[in-house]
Swiss-Prot record:
UniProt GO cellular component terms: cytosol
Xref: NCBIfam families: dnlj, PRK07956.1
Gene name for this UniProt entry: ligA
Disulphide-bridged cysteine pairs: none
Coiled-coil annotated spans: none
Name by which UniProt lists this protein: DNA ligase
Gene3D superfamilies tied to this protein: 5' to 3' exonuclease, C-terminal subdomain, 6.20.10.30, BRCT domain, DNA ligase/mRNA capping enzyme, Helix hairpin bin, Nucleic acid-binding proteins
Length: 671
């Protein structure tokens, strides 16, 4: 029995440590799946030895103590957790337990919701006015986050409608959409601030700021999923009915809430959500399944830490632990040196992962990563797997320092890192084989010169056989030379030559984009082409003149200026023009002479349009004298927001920029 007691003590100590890291420090060290495994192991041992259960065991309570920096709010109704199931068999067993426990043969219907990966909060309204908000904390006492919650635009400060209870405590999840998470980390990397490992940590860190002004700058949102206190009023007698009532009063509720009539329908809902998960725009880690009838919920009751009438059906873990066996360095199209962790292969979210990006030297330093470390790997949707954190408590003794190269691993040229930039780059330019391949692939891509039939494998062979060194060499290729490549017959070779000939007729914007100037995407290339009109004017532009172009700041202006100042680049451009690459003469548009509501305005498009393509919309706006930019800044005059508009819309609202929808855009275009 002594060994069992020791196991229980060790498990409880380990779980308490990780609960503290997760709930209090917002710095989890292990994946949720590993925590769940430890909790299951503890619960199984306690079930076999109930005499050894202690009141302070992690199985007997919900979370961890609140931060001392916040005042505390005691929950009038405890905020309990949910039990988890991880496969269909376990869910069906839960379904059977529910059916068996009910005293009548009344049919059970299930209300199914998304299990959001954010921070659980309670919000108290008195006579319809928001008076307080708290985190879950330990389930009994939470942190007072009222000032911060008031900054979240999705949460109404006052409910609207009729028959609002005198006191109503709603519960839900504060979370951060993916677009907002990426923007926060992008800004943090640029300013040297804290980079968050995942949206959940970012949401928690944003909500638990002591300064509400910081929270207000974060694009947090909220979905309501339940009720705590209810006094001086009534609510519907079904869970779904209550959610719909909350929605009528102005509280946000997920539109994916679904009523299922059977266990089979619940499983179908689970698999549909799992399929849609990568496109939701925010993180979820499963679905929550609740008995819909409040009367049946009351019959079923609660266990120590969770209701018997609800369960969380979790998806396969998106995080797993493994070991870093080595770190290698890859060279990209623009010469960026990217460290890649070579991992002990591990299944993450159903995919075998053996590599993970480490981004740059700063990220390696932030993680404190060494070769041989045990790490947490995260893979969400189609995102490239990344190292979330190092499990320092389990660091082996024989780890080695990661040494960033001083010379390019491909061509041996010096590696430089510009002050203020996180990325180190090879200085080899066109002599670097890695850059040559990638820059040529970019040059012929669909949105650049659009050379039909010239895929990556052809470019690889052309470079390896040294048939092509610069983009201009592509237009010197003959069908005879191309037939020497693998799987390239005379007909295919002639088709590629014809495609190259066709690609010579392009646009100034496409040509600029195809050159692969650092940080010049399609929108910036279009802006440069529209502003300067000719290649000669652009080549002669100073850094100050370049910054007059919408969406071009000092960094991009410097990259463009330096690119055209480099003689070898100008020589390649001259060769391309000599080979016949051309585009129409610019149509000079004087915004002052155009009678249009868009004339002279800097406009940004965001979201998807239903009545026309974005390219058509851009072209029409330019015709009417607008300058179409790719990102929102203080220079922006107008944002046109289509469906599923994301971070650009949020930034426009933050800056107080005028926003119109597609319908209004079409009306103005027609006027």
């Amino acid at each position: 029995m002594e060994s069992i007691e020791q196991q229980l003590t060790e498990l409880r100590t380990t779980l308490r440590h990780h609960e503290y890291l997760y709930h209090v420090m917002d710095a989890p060290e292990i994946p949720d799946a590993e925590y769940d495994r430890l909790m299951r192991e503890l619960r199984e041992l306690e079930t076999k030895h109930p005499e050894l259960i202690t009141p302070d065991s992690p199985t007997q309570r919900v979370g961890a103590a609140p931060l001392a920096a916040f005042s505390q709010i005691r929950h009038e109704v405890p905020m309990l957790s949910l039990d988890n199931v991880f496969d269909e068999e376990s869910f069906l067993a839960f379904n059977k337990r529910v059916q068996d426990r009910l005293k009548s043969n009344e049919k059970v219907t299930w209300c199914c919701e998304l299990k959001l990966d954010g921070l659980a909060v309670s919000i108290l309204y008195e006579n319809g006015v928001l008076v307080s908000a708290a985190t879950r904390g330990d389930g009994t006492t939470g942190e007072d986050i009222t000032s911060n919650v008031r900054t979240i635009r999705a949460i109404p400060l006052k409910l609207h409608g009729e028959n609002i209870p005198a006191r109503l405590e709603v519960r839900g999840e504060v979370f951060l959409p993916q677009a907002g998470f990426e923007k926060i980390n992008e800004d943090a990397r640029r300013t040297g601030g804290k980079v968050f490992a995942n949206p959940r940590n970012a949401a928690a860190g944003s909500l638990r700021q002591l300064d509400p002004r910081i929270t207000a700058k974060r694009p947090l949102t909220f979905f309501c999923y339940g009720v705590g206190v209810l006094e001086g009023g009534e609510l519907p007698d079904t869970h779904l009915g209550r959610l719909m009532q909350f929605k009528a009063w102005g509280l946000p509720v997920s539109d994916r809430v679904t009523l299922c009539e059977s266990a089979e329908e619940v499983l179908a809902f689970y698999h549909k959500v799992e399929e849609d998960r990568p496109t939701l725009g925010f993180d979820i880690d499963g679905v929550v399944i609740k008995v819909n009838s409040l009367a049946q919920q009351e019959q079923l009751g609660f266990v120590a830490r969770a209701p018997r009438w609800a369960v969380a059906f979790k998806f396969p873990a998106q995080e797993q632990m493994t070991f870093v066996r080595d770190v290698e360095f890859q060279v990209g199209r623009t010469g960026a040196i990217t460290p890649v962790a070579r991992l002990e292969p591990v299944h993450v979210a159903g995919v075998l992962v053996s590599n993970a990006t480490l981004h740059n030297a700063d990220e390696i330093e932030r993680l404190g990563l060494r070769i041989g470390d045990k790490v947490v790997i995260r893979r969400a949707g189609d995102v490239i797997p990344q190292v979330v954190n190092v499990v320092l408590s389990e660091r082996p003794e024989d780890t080695r320092e990661v040494v960033f190269p001083t010379h390019c691993p491909v061509c041996g040229s010096d590696v430089e890192r510009v002050e203020g930039e996180a990325v180190a780059r090879c200085t080899g330019g066109l002599i670097c084989g890695a850059q040559r391949k990638e820059s040529l692939k970019h040059f012929v891509s669909r949105r650049a010169m659009d050379v039909d039939g010239m895929g990556d494998k052809i470019i690889d062979q052309l470079v390896e056989k040294e048939y092509v060194h610069t983009p201009a060499d592509l237009f010197k290729l003959t069908a005879g030379k191309l037939t020497g490549l693998e799987r390239m017959g005379p007909k295919s070779a002639q088709n590629v030559v014809n495609a190259l000939e066709k690609a010579k007729e392009t646009t100034f914007a496409r040509f600029l984009y195809a050159l692969g100037v650092r940080e010049v995407g399609e929108a910036t290339a279009a802006g440069l082409a529209a502003y300067f009109g000719t290649l000669e004017a652009l080549e002669a532009a100073s850094i100050e003149e370049l910054q007059k172009v919408p969406d071009v700041g000092i960094v991009v202006a410097s990259h463009v200026h330096n690119f055209f100042a480099e003689e070898s680049n100008r020589n390649v451009i001259s060769e391309l023009l000599a080979e016949g690459v051309h585009w129409p003469e610019p149509i000079v548009i004087n915004a002052e002479e155009i009678d249009s509501p868009f004339a002279g305005k800097t406009v940004v498009l965001t979201g998807s349009l239903s009545q026309m393509s974005r390219d058509d919309a851009k072209a029409r706006l330019v015709e009417l004298g607008a300058k179409v930019a790719g990102s929102v800044s203080k220079k922006t005059d107008l944002v046109i927001a289509g469906e599923a508009a994301g971070s650009k819309l949020a930034k426009a609202q933050e800056l107080g920029i005028e926003v119109i929808d597609e319908t209004e855009m079409l009306r103005l275009l027609g006027s």
